[in-house]
């Protein structure tokens, strides 16, 4: 691909020039208010630069094409299945050499309570707490539980913690035959870990090996990372500390959503809360070239107005605020590489730039992120547009999540776009849309939960995509 195709007007043109506009015939310049005429003396290369914007086209190779085909075909033959194994990822062949952690190293290198790690504290769970019933006992025979209290408390943990611990136990037996995983501490009801600890919520475990061989602990920490723990710390020579996200936030890994009160701009110029959007509404989106365009909402990948959810909230210097689930893809402008990419929301940092709509000109321009915070709110809405993108609260974002490739995710939803097109051709559907007895938003109101196709894609992603391509 010609390198000029990937160049960006606001990076290559003078700083006063902007070419992201809903009206492609206009060129806005602070030095001149005149319009660019078709016969103006603009070199062909400059015209080409002005026609192409921001979004770096990644030509899919053979592997990407094969994965896209699998994403298209496998969901159509999807059927539910039950497994006797401890969880996802069990029994996989190790694909690369693993290196042990060093003392005091943590993965990820973030604070434990950030959304990119195990997430915020939700409060201690006591035996008389309503949340106590959410803790599950772990009777895995491949795990030794020290249980110093003699109450069985160390066997209690969150569902996600149990799943990851069982995967780790299997890995330990494969790595060191005859050695088992030792859990020294899990859920703690005696408050022996300071004021703030995920042990009080059943979301943390302190582990070692049954032979107490400290030379193994660096690799044990690495195996815990591979097992899927959200935060792992080689905190001491005597043990490893691991923690996970809360079970209530697991849905943020299944899908990507916005809050219902976030707004989208309709084609008529009216802002509408996402919770009130209807299938068929045309909302402001962004093309693959980075141009603003209005696109039809064809379905809701998730819609649940009563679900509590953890979100990442991004604040920009211009005053835009986007609230989105951690695994959602958001457009990020990379000035050092002069390209526009899509990044998981919980990996966006302060001083990075996102695309924000200018209210006066309608253009999409980079705006610096000045604050990133974790919040908890009620309700999730995930509209899917035909373009696969949507501008929410003036910030350009993807409609997709979990997979770190916008183009591959868009390929995966191609059957739904085709189905929507075929349905639009049916006369009966046109009659239903025009009838007052069948309001246009009835299908959205009936949906409560994840769309069946999106759920099918989530279930197969672990088998067709490398771990590095997924949000874990």
Curated annotation (Swiss-Prot):
Site feature (Cleavage) residues: 256-257
Lipid-bearing positions (Cholesterol glycine ester): 256
Binding site for Ca(2+) 2: 149, 185, 188, 190
Gene Ontology process terms (BP): anatomical structure morphogenesis; cell fate specification; cell-cell signaling; intein-mediated protein splicing; protein autoprocessing; regulation of gene expression; segment polarity determination; self proteolysis
Compartments reported by the entry: Nucleus; Cytoplasm
Sites marked Involved in auto-cleavage: 325
InterPro entries noted in UniProt: Hedgehog, Hedgehog_Hint, Hedgehog_sig/DD-Pept_Zn-bd_sf, Hedgehog_Signaling, Hedgehog_signalling_dom, Hint_dom_C, Hint_dom_N, Hint_dom_sf
Keyword match tRNA processing: no
Marked site positions, Involved in cholesterol transfer: 302
PROSITE patterns the record matches: INTEIN_N_TER
Site feature location: Essential for auto-cleavage: 328
EC class of the enzyme, as a word: hydrolase
Lipid-conjugated positions (N-palmitoyl cysteine): 84
Keywords, comma-separated and alphabetical: Autocatalytic cleavage, Calcium, Cell membrane, Cytoplasm, Developmental protein, Hydrolase, Lipoprotein, Membrane, Metal-binding, Morphogen, Nucleus, Palmitate, Protease, Segmentation polarity protein, Signal, Transferase
EC number from the UniProt entry: 3.1.-.-
A family per Pfam: Hint
Principal location class: nucleus
Family as reported in the entry's similarity comment: Belongs to the hedgehog family.
Subunit field text: Interacts with shf.
Stated name of the protein: Protein hedgehog
Organism: Drosophila ananassae
Upper classification of the organism: Eukaryota, Metazoa, Ecdysozoa, Arthropoda, Hexapoda
Gene name of the record: hh
């Amino acid at each position: 691909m010609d390198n000029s195709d990937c160049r960006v007007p606001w990076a290559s043109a003078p700083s006063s020039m902007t070419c992201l506009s809903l009206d492609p015939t206009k060129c806005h310049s602070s030095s001149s208010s005149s319009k660019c005429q078709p016969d103006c003396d603009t070199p062909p290369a400059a015209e080409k630069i002005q026609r192409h914007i921001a979004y770096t086209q990644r030509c899919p190779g053979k592997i990407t094409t094969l994965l896209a085909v699998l994403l298209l075909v496998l969901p159509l033959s999807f059927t539910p299945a039950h497994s006797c194994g401890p969880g996802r990822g069990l029994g996989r062949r190790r694909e690369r050499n693993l290196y042990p952690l060093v003392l005091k190293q943590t993965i990820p290198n973030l604070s434990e309570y950030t959304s990119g790690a195990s997430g915020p504290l939700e409060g201690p769970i006591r035996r008389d707490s309503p949340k106590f019933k959410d803790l599950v006992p772990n009777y895995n025979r491949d795990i030794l539980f020290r249980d110093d209290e003699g109450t069985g408390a160390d066997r209690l943990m969150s569902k996600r913690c149990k799943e990851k611990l069982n995967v780790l136990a299997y890995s330990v037996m494969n790595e060191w035959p005859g050695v088992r995983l030792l859990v020294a501490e899990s859920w703690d009801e005696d408050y022996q870990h300071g004021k703030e600890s995920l042990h009080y919520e059943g979301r943390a475990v302190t582990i070692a090996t049954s032979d107490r061989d400290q030379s193994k602990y660096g690799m044990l920490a690495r195996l815990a990372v591979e097992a899927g723990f959200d935060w792992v710390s080689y905190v001491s020579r005597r043990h490893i500390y691991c923690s996970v996200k809360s079970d209530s936030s697991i849905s943020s890994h299944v899908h990507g959503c916005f809050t219902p009160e976030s707004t989208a701009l309709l084609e008529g110029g009216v802002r509408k809360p996402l919770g009130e959007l209807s299938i068929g509404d045309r909302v402001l989106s962004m093309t693959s070239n980075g141009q603003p365009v209005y696109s039809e909402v064809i379905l809701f990948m998730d819609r649940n107005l009563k679900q509590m959810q953890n979100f990442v909230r991004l604040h920009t210097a211009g005053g835009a605020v986007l609230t989105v689930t951690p695994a959602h893809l958001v457009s990020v402008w990379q000035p050092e590489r002069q390209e526009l990419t899509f990044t998981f929301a919980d990996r966006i940092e302060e001083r990075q730039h996102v695309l924000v709509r200018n209210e006066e000109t309608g253009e999409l321009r980079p705006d610096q992120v000045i604050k990133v915070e974790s919040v908890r709110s009620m309700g999730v809405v995930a509209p899917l547009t035909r373009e696969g993108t949507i501008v929410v609260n003036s910030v350009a974002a993807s409609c997709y999540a979990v997979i770190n490739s916008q183009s591959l995710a868009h390929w995966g939803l191609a059957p739904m776009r085709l189905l929507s097109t075929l349905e639009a051709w049916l006369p009966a559907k046109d009659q239903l849309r025009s009838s007052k007895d069948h309001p246009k938003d009835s299908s959205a109101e009936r949906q409560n939960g994840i769309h069946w196709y999106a759920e099918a894609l989530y279930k197969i992603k672990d088998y067709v995509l490398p771990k590095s391509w997924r949000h874990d």
